[in-house]
């Protein structure tokens, strides 16, 4: 089982895109942008960590690079959750758990 480190910031999807796909495949950012039908600036901002992966971008990258869209979205959500935990940790710590848990089931009689 692969353990995901929780003590350091997760890898930005753009870094993964650059190091694990673009560089080994010999593809430029512009070539990728043209191939998936997005502006060059969008890919450049993702690669440089200034923009996240949207569901639309995940679908496009997945199709072109032959990986699951979930691969890209999971990278992004891990990063987003880590960042928001760091930013809002004090406020989140103040939240008390609900005294009861509500369990619902669908399709019951």
Residue ranges and their predicted role:
Residues 1-2, 91:
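General nucleic-acid-binding
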Residues 2-27:
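A short, Lys/Arg-rich alpha-helix, primarily the initiator
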Residues 71-109:
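Short, charged recognition helix plus adjacent turn
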Residues 27-45:
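Short alpha-helical DNA-recognition segment
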Residues 22, 33, 62:
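The alpha-helix within a helix-turn-helix
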Residues 37, 48, 77:
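Residue-level detection of the helix-turn-helix DNA-binding "recognition helix"
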Residues 50-63:
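Short, basic-rich loop-to-helix N-cap that marks the start of a DNA-contacting helix
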């Amino acid at each position: 089982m692969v353990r995901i480190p929780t003590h350091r910031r997760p890898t930005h999807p753009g870094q993964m895109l650059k190091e694990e796909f673009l560089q080994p495949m010999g593809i430029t950012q512009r070539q990728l942008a043209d191939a998936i039908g997005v502006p060059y600036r969008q890919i450049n901002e993702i690669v440089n960590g200034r923009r996240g992966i949207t569901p639309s971008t995940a679908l496009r990258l997945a199709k072109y690079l032959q990986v699951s869209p979930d691969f890209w979205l999971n990278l992004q959500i891990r990063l987003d959750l880590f960042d928001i935990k760091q930013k809002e940790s004090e406020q989140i710590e103040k939240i008390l758990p609900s005294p009861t848990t509500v369990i619902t089931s669908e399709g019951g009689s």
